[in-house]
């Protein structure tokens, strides 16, 4: 089974940083923040194999434009697949109420 190269758009990196900062500094739960970021990163890099297992995005931002989504806890990871380059580009990671 061929693998895909997973890349994070600058926005996705900023989203992950923001999630960590909010939980660690605002909620004062640094350990919880680290564990959540680990789970989100594990999910993101699981897209190296079988990224088509995730459904196309049908509602909200990025809907019906070829983007796919992966739901992890209360977060939505939104990404595109570039088949020619065998690449998955994660464009954003959003709290589900905003996704």
Ranges and model annotations:
Residues 1-66:
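Basic, Lys/Arg-enriched alpha-helical interface segments
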